[in-house]
Amino acid sequence: MNKEKELIDKLIDLAFAEDIGDGDHTTLSCIPATAMGKSNLLIKEAGVLAGIEVAKEIFNRFDPTMKVEVFINDGTEVEPGDVAMLVEGKVQSLLQTERLMLNVMQRMSGIATMTRKYAKKLEGTRTHVLDTRKTTPGMRILEKMAVKIGGGVNHRIGLFDMILLKDNHVDFAGGIDKAITRAKEYCKEKGKDLKIEIEVRNFDELQQVLDLGGVDRIMFDNFTPEMTKKAVEMVAGKYETESSGGITFDTLRDYAECGVDFISVGALTHSVKGLDMSFKAC
């Protein structure tokens, strides 16, 4: 079992335990165990669909006898009135899986919709939009999947798959040179093949990084577009570049036109609105 599926399965199991507890007594009290039925996933708002594959796993994990017919795949732009899938099986199973499936699909589709909007604004530039670790606890893997479905690029998944030396790391380590040197020594000692990124707050710190080297990417933190343009010129293609901090949808293109490789946007995941949809008997 790969790590991604393992995390998703754990999330599904936890969500069912949280929601159902010792039983869905509403359903169990009024729906016969033998009753069979069908439900449609109805789209009620324009956006980008995401989470279909996870929804299939939710149904299968709860009741492998449920049958799912998919009409619209992940990444497709949808409109109100579209029917994304049909699910057939025991009515008790349909009712007990409905809320978890909708919670996941609405959240993922909202993120994919937001990401697509940002990605489209970057068309014609070299810049890609990145997500961050500003995610819902326990749902990061799904939210980062949604970013990719929407056309964005995942930054590191967690603290384990990349070294990102932020301002606090630099300050606690005693400066940029010590932070980079220790990070490189750590990777060598531990046999870790990890990319190293460092955040800089001004041109002095940027010049220190350029003089020392030893990193893969430089993040410009809270730079203005004018500062970013100069910073990109200073880096001169030697390292990947990333803009972060205070960048809005309205200013996104201004930063991209400075020539940065990536722009990280926490808003893709931390404050997104779910896409409206419903799961109705048919």
Please describe what each predicted stretch is:
Residues 221-222, 245, 267-268:
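Short secondary-structure boundary segments
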Residues 249:
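Cys/His-rich Zn2+-binding cysteine-cluster or related metal-binding knuckle/ribbon modules and their
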